């Protein structure tokens, strides 16, 4: 059910929202303009290649404290993984823009570039921490709909990621 939602402040509890495009939405056609931030920072999104795994693993370790290169390798083989580059350096990757994928990015602009470049979202949408107000409000402004609100739960120690991300349900 698509209930109206309000933006959460940056200090909100750990919640994620599942996002999808409304049926017939023109948002998918806005990929080129949406791939630039308000500061016109150029970010290029392309399919991930096996040669990208080490750089992506290092980025994931920088953001999360561990790497998820096994999942990335599988996603590259399935041709669902993408990377975003800025100044010829990988600044983010996604195994899949969808419910079962995850993404890691150095900046919010890198995460938004990958979302904007996605031709579709797999499954019911993708999970996005709604406490990331900048990306949350950008999604709303670009016609995405909050489908459900969820709570991030962990067993044991949890370290807040040091960058932009969206979690996957499989890890």
What is each of the regions a protein language model found here?
Residues 35-50:
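Conserved N-terminal entry element of GNAT/NAT acetyltransferase domains
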Residues 6-10, 16-38, 146-158:
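Conserved catalytic-core motifs of GNAT/GCN5-like acyltransferases
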Residues 2-3, 11-14, 46-171:
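Intrinsically disordered, low-complexity, positively biased terminal segments
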């Amino acid at each position: 059910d698509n209930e109206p939602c309000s933006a959460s402040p940056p200090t909100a509890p750990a919640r994620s929202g599942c996002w999808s495009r409304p049926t017939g939405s023109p948002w998918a056609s806005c990929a080129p303009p949406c791939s630039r931030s308000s500061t016109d920072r150029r970010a290029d999104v392309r399919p991930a290649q096996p040669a990208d795994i080490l750089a992506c693993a290092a980025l994931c370790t920088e953001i999360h404290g561990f790497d998820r290169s096994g999942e990335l390798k599988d996603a590259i083989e399935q041709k669902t993984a993408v990377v975003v580059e800025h100044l010829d350096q990988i600044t983010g990757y996604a195994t899949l823009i969808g419910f079962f994928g995850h993404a890691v990015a150095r900046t919010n602009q890198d995460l938004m570039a990958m979302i904007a470049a996605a031709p579709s979202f797999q499954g019911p949408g993708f999970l996005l921490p709604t406490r990331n107000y900048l990306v949350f409000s950008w999604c709303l402004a670009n016609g995405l709909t909050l489908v459900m609100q969820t709570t991030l739960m962990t067993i044991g120690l949890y370290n807040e990621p040091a960058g932009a991300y969206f979690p996957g349900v499989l890890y």
